[in-house]
Amino acid sequence: VYMYMFAWESPVMDGILRSTHCMEIPLVFNNVVRHASMTGGGKAAQVLADKMSSAWLNFARTGNPNTEGLPEWEPYTADKGATMIFDNDCGMKYNHDKELLEVVMTFPVRGF
């Protein structure tokens, strides 16, 4: 299992969208220009899209997302909580938001 967090903020509308839900989809599928209304279609988005789409393709082919241009992406474990942060500068964080997740886990569980 590999964990990631998409932290890149779109420049569209003076950045008001920030890093909204599903914002990474055009980058994962390397459709930055086609979805410029979300990504801005600029160089920073394209550079990140190249990295992300390569990682997703490599994972689909081999089960391992590691690819050129990214730091080593370690598998997620409960102990380490290795998480790849996708932003202009990509990197690994460990036990990212651990305190927040501990609070969330105290919430009562309700059925759907």
Model feature map: region roles:
Residues 1-112:
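C-terminal helix-and-tail extensions that cap enzymatic domains
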